[in-house]
Amino acid sequence: IDTFGDVSVRSRSDVNILAVVNTKTKHIQLINTPRDYYIEHPKSNGVKDKLTHAGLYGVENSIGALENLYGVKINYYVRMNFSGFEDIIDAMGGIDVYSDKDFTVEPVKHYTVGVNHLSGIEALAFARERHAFAAGDIQRGQNQMKVIIAMINKLSSKDVLYNYSNVLDGIAGTFQTDMASDDIYTLVKKQLVDNTKYTIDSYSVTGTGDSCTTYSTPKTKVWVMQPNMDEVEHAKGLINSVLSE
């Protein structure tokens, strides 16, 4: 969510990534949905709204919006804000992120093409920047996926897994999840026994810019993204493919 400080507050969702995980085949498919996607959510009474606005009505509402869009049941969620994002990455000792662009975010860091080792604040700046790119929000979405992939790779490494309880203690209160601690422990134990790396694929749906009123702004037109439904259908196929492996 697009706030610092207390993670429990209701706020707009800044990044919306659906992770489809098959623990048997060690395959993860990430689906990124732009925050300005113009879709319905459970609280919008059939009126379209920005996906980011869904979070104003609770995390369950954001989950419902993505479930409706992709026709899939979401079993668990992880919710964090900017502060928690920075804290988690710092607790892991930083992450290694590949950049396909050379750019600078003042006054944080200059990012070079190739692998960049990033602290929490540097990873956040990398994930949020869009003005440096001709593709704008599309490139930002791709960079956000790269950060998530780097986080998954670091979290599934032996160095972190062997110390996962210390890592969790260090980031307590920086994120919210409905996954029980026993379920987290089971996943950690399984990964320690079979340290095969996960294959991680990513896909971002896009759309066309438009100006429309929304459920949350009924009297004011705002910039939205009309979904490319062919890409949404392709994303559905990717999701079902991983689940059926």
Sequence positions of predicted segments:
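Non-catalytic, solvent-exposed segments at the cell envelope interface
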Residues: I1-E245
